[in-house]
A protein has these predicted regions:
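Double-stranded RNA-binding/processing signature
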Residues: 1-175
Length: 175
Protein backbone atom coordinates (compact mmCIF):
# COMPACT_ATOMS: atom_id res chain seq x y z
CA UNK A 1 0.00 0.00 0.00
CA UNK A 2 1.39 3.41 -0.99
CA UNK A 3 0.81 6.26 1.47
CA UNK A 4 2.45 9.12 -0.48
CA UNK A 5 5.10 10.68 1.75
CA UNK A 6 4.74 7.95 4.40
CA UNK A 7 5.86 4.36 4.39
CA UNK A 8 3.77 1.72 6.15
CA UNK A 9 5.94 1.80 9.28
CA UNK A 10 5.75 5.58 9.57
CA UNK A 11 1.99 5.48 9.09
CA UNK A 12 1.58 2.84 11.81
CA UNK A 13 3.69 5.02 14.09
CA UNK A 14 1.55 8.06 13.28
CA UNK A 15 -1.63 6.11 14.12
CA UNK A 16 -0.13 5.09 17.45
CA UNK A 17 0.87 8.69 18.18
CA UNK A 18 -2.65 9.93 17.36
CA UNK A 19 -4.17 7.44 19.78
CA UNK A 20 -1.71 8.44 22.50
CA UNK A 21 -2.33 12.16 22.01
CA UNK A 22 -6.09 11.63 21.95
CA UNK A 23 -6.00 9.47 25.06
CA UNK A 24 -8.13 6.94 23.24
CA UNK A 25 -7.26 3.51 21.85
CA UNK A 26 -9.49 2.30 19.03
CA UNK A 27 -11.13 -1.10 19.41
CA UNK A 28 -11.46 -1.19 15.62
CA UNK A 29 -8.46 0.41 13.89
CA UNK A 30 -10.42 0.25 10.64
CA UNK A 31 -12.50 3.16 11.91
CA UNK A 32 -9.40 5.26 12.48
CA UNK A 33 -8.07 4.33 9.05
CA UNK A 34 -11.37 5.29 7.42
CA UNK A 35 -11.41 8.63 9.28
CA UNK A 36 -8.00 9.37 7.80
CA UNK A 37 -8.84 8.33 4.22
CA UNK A 38 -9.49 11.33 1.98
CA UNK A 39 -11.59 10.88 -1.15
CA UNK A 40 -8.56 11.68 -3.33
CA UNK A 41 -6.75 8.65 -1.89
CA UNK A 42 -9.75 6.36 -2.28
CA UNK A 43 -10.21 7.37 -5.92
CA UNK A 44 -6.60 6.43 -6.70
CA UNK A 45 -6.58 3.19 -4.67
CA UNK A 46 -9.23 0.62 -5.60
CA UNK A 47 -8.32 -1.35 -2.45
CA UNK A 48 -9.66 1.60 -0.40
CA UNK A 49 -13.12 2.13 -1.88
CA UNK A 50 -14.41 4.12 1.12
CA UNK A 51 -13.39 7.53 2.41
CA UNK A 52 -14.10 9.70 5.42
CA UNK A 53 -17.01 11.91 4.31
CA UNK A 54 -19.75 9.91 6.07
CA UNK A 55 -17.72 9.91 9.28
CA UNK A 56 -17.21 13.64 8.81
CA UNK A 57 -20.99 14.10 8.67
CA UNK A 58 -21.45 12.17 11.91
CA UNK A 59 -18.48 13.80 13.62
CA UNK A 60 -19.79 17.27 12.82
CA UNK A 61 -23.01 16.44 14.70
CA UNK A 62 -21.11 14.94 17.64
CA UNK A 63 -18.84 17.99 17.82
CA UNK A 64 -21.78 20.42 17.77
CA UNK A 65 -23.58 18.44 20.47
CA UNK A 66 -20.59 18.19 22.81
CA UNK A 67 -19.59 21.83 22.43
CA UNK A 68 -23.20 22.98 22.82
CA UNK A 69 -23.56 20.98 26.03
CA UNK A 70 -20.29 22.30 27.40
CA UNK A 71 -21.29 25.91 26.75
CA UNK A 72 -24.84 25.33 28.05
CA UNK A 73 -23.49 23.96 31.34
CA UNK A 74 -20.64 26.46 31.75
CA UNK A 75 -22.61 29.61 30.88
CA UNK A 76 -26.02 29.29 32.57
CA UNK A 77 -26.83 33.01 32.37
CA UNK A 78 -25.87 33.52 28.72
CA UNK A 79 -28.49 33.96 26.00
CA UNK A 80 -28.87 31.68 22.97
CA UNK A 81 -27.30 34.10 20.49
CA UNK A 82 -24.11 34.38 22.52
CA UNK A 83 -24.00 30.61 23.02
CA UNK A 84 -24.31 30.19 19.25
CA UNK A 85 -21.44 32.64 18.58
CA UNK A 86 -19.28 30.87 21.16
CA UNK A 87 -20.06 27.49 19.63
CA UNK A 88 -19.23 28.79 16.17
CA UNK A 89 -15.81 29.90 17.40
CA UNK A 90 -15.12 26.41 18.76
CA UNK A 91 -16.27 24.38 15.76
CA UNK A 92 -15.24 26.47 12.76
CA UNK A 93 -12.85 25.23 10.09
CA UNK A 94 -9.82 26.95 11.63
CA UNK A 95 -10.49 25.59 15.13
CA UNK A 96 -11.09 22.07 13.82
CA UNK A 97 -7.85 22.20 11.81
CA UNK A 98 -6.04 23.21 15.00
CA UNK A 99 -7.47 20.21 16.84
CA UNK A 100 -6.37 18.00 13.93
CA UNK A 101 -2.82 19.36 14.09
CA UNK A 102 -2.69 18.92 17.87
CA UNK A 103 -3.55 15.25 17.46
CA UNK A 104 -1.17 14.78 14.52
CA UNK A 105 -3.88 13.96 11.98
CA UNK A 106 -2.04 16.09 9.42
CA UNK A 107 0.82 13.58 9.46
CA UNK A 108 -1.38 10.54 8.95
CA UNK A 109 -4.19 11.50 6.59
CA UNK A 110 -4.15 9.43 3.41
CA UNK A 111 -4.20 11.70 0.36
CA UNK A 112 -4.04 11.13 -3.36
CA UNK A 113 -0.83 12.09 -5.15
CA UNK A 114 -2.09 15.40 -6.52
CA UNK A 115 -3.78 16.42 -3.26
CA UNK A 116 -0.56 15.65 -1.42
CA UNK A 117 1.49 17.64 -3.96
CA UNK A 118 -0.92 20.57 -3.70
CA UNK A 119 -0.38 20.89 0.06
CA UNK A 120 -3.53 19.18 1.28
CA UNK A 121 -1.90 18.28 4.61
CA UNK A 122 -1.65 21.98 5.43
CA UNK A 123 -5.10 23.09 4.26
CA UNK A 124 -7.47 24.01 7.10
CA UNK A 125 -10.58 22.82 5.26
CA UNK A 126 -9.15 19.34 4.69
CA UNK A 127 -7.79 19.06 8.23
CA UNK A 128 -11.00 20.34 9.79
CA UNK A 129 -12.95 17.72 7.87
CA UNK A 130 -10.47 15.04 8.98
CA UNK A 131 -10.95 16.07 12.61
CA UNK A 132 -14.73 15.78 12.30
CA UNK A 133 -14.30 12.33 10.72
CA UNK A 134 -11.91 11.35 13.52
CA UNK A 135 -14.41 12.42 16.19
CA UNK A 136 -17.15 10.51 14.36
CA UNK A 137 -14.93 7.42 14.37
CA UNK A 138 -14.27 7.78 18.11
CA UNK A 139 -18.02 8.10 18.70
CA UNK A 140 -18.80 4.93 16.71
CA UNK A 141 -15.96 3.03 18.35
CA UNK A 142 -16.44 4.09 21.97
CA UNK A 143 -19.61 6.13 22.35
CA UNK A 144 -20.38 9.70 23.29
CA UNK A 145 -18.36 9.54 26.53
CA UNK A 146 -15.23 8.54 24.62
CA UNK A 147 -15.78 11.36 22.13
CA UNK A 148 -16.19 13.82 25.01
CA UNK A 149 -12.96 12.60 26.68
CA UNK A 150 -11.07 13.11 23.41
CA UNK A 151 -12.55 16.54 22.72
CA UNK A 152 -12.44 18.13 26.18
CA UNK A 153 -8.65 18.63 26.45
CA UNK A 154 -8.51 20.13 22.96
CA UNK A 155 -10.98 22.93 23.71
CA UNK A 156 -9.87 26.24 25.23
CA UNK A 157 -11.40 27.38 28.53
CA UNK A 158 -14.98 28.58 28.06
CA UNK A 159 -14.14 32.01 29.50
CA UNK A 160 -11.50 32.57 26.80
CA UNK A 161 -13.96 31.61 24.08
CA UNK A 162 -16.67 33.85 25.53
CA UNK A 163 -14.27 36.81 25.79
CA UNK A 164 -13.07 36.34 22.20
CA UNK A 165 -16.63 36.01 20.87
CA UNK A 166 -17.54 39.30 22.59
CA UNK A 167 -14.52 41.04 21.03
CA UNK A 168 -15.46 39.70 17.60
CA UNK A 169 -19.00 41.06 18.03
CA UNK A 170 -18.78 44.17 20.26
CA UNK A 171 -22.32 45.28 19.41
CA UNK A 172 -23.66 41.93 20.57
CA UNK A 173 -21.66 42.11 23.79
CA UNK A 174 -23.45 45.36 24.69
CA UNK A 175 -26.94 43.92 24.12
Amino acid sequence: MQFFNLNAGEWAGALEEIQQKAGYRFNDLGRLRLALTHSSYASENPSSPEWNERLEFLGDAVLELLVSRRLFDALPDVQEGTLTRNRSALVDEHANAGYARTLGLDRAILLGKSECRDGGRKRDSLLGDAFEAFLGAVYLDGGIEAAERVLAPLLPPVKDVSDNASKANPKGALQ
